[in-house]
């Protein structure tokens, strides 16, 4: 039986393969979720640069959020990163959830990013 760490690594590798297969040169919307905060970046893997980034620790959001660890905070981060990406000229991305299950905060962030103008 696989340990929880091995399961996480396998899931991350599986998602990474899927993202790589469908990317076709599109930037990647990469999500990292911790117990207290959520972080997201729009990364251009071809050039190796971060186009836009946002997190619950951003000055724009930190004072407005009750906590960085709930779905409302994730939605605010999703909307903010979408706004920054559209401003930088990116409208189509590939969603990279990493090893995180598409549920709860990750799902709230994705839906808010779609509402903000990103398509994936």
From Swiss-Prot:
MF annotations from Gene Ontology: 5S rRNA binding; structural constituent of ribosome
GO cellular component: cytosolic large ribosomal subunit
One Pfam family hit: Ribosomal_L18p
Gene3D superfamilies: 3.30.420.100
CDD domains linked to this entry: Ribosomal_L18_L5e
Keyword annotations of the record: Ribonucleoprotein, Ribosomal protein, RNA-binding, rRNA-binding
InterPro entries: Ribosomal_uL18_bac-type, Ribosomal_uL18_bac/euk
Source domain of life: Bacteria
One record GO biological process: translation
Matching NCBIfam families: L18_bact (TIGR00060)
UniProt similarity note: Belongs to the universal ribosomal protein uL18 family.
Subunit structure, interactors included: Part of the 50S ribosomal subunit; part of the 5S rRNA/L5/L18/L25 subcomplex. Contacts the 5S and 23S rRNAs.
HAMAP family for this protein: Ribosomal_uL18_B
Role noted for this protein: This is one of the proteins that bind and probably mediate the attachment of the 5S RNA into the large ribosomal subunit, where it forms part of the central protuberance.
Name by which UniProt lists this protein: Large ribosomal subunit protein uL18
Species per Swiss-Prot/TrEMBL record: Brucella anthropi (strain ATCC 49188 / DSM 6882 / CCUG 24695 / JCM 21032 / LMG 3331 / NBRC 15819 / NCTC 12168 / Alc 37) (Ochrobactrum anthropi)
């Amino acid at each position: 039986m696989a340990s929880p760490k091995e399961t996480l690594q396998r899931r991350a590798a599986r998602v990474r393969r899927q993202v790589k297969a469908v990317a076709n040169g599109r930037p990647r919307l990469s999500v990292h979720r911790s117990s207290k905060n959520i972080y997201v970046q729009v990364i251009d893997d071809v050039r190796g640069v971060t186009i836009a980034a946002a997190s619950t620790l951003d000055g724009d959001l930190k004072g407005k959020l009750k906590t960085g660890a709930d779905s409302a905070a994730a939605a605010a981060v999703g909307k903010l990163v979408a706004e920054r990406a559209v401003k930088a000229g990116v409208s189509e991305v590939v969603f990279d959830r990493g090893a995180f299950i598409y549920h709860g905060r990750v799902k709230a962030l994705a839906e808010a990013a779609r509402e903000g103008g990103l398509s994936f």
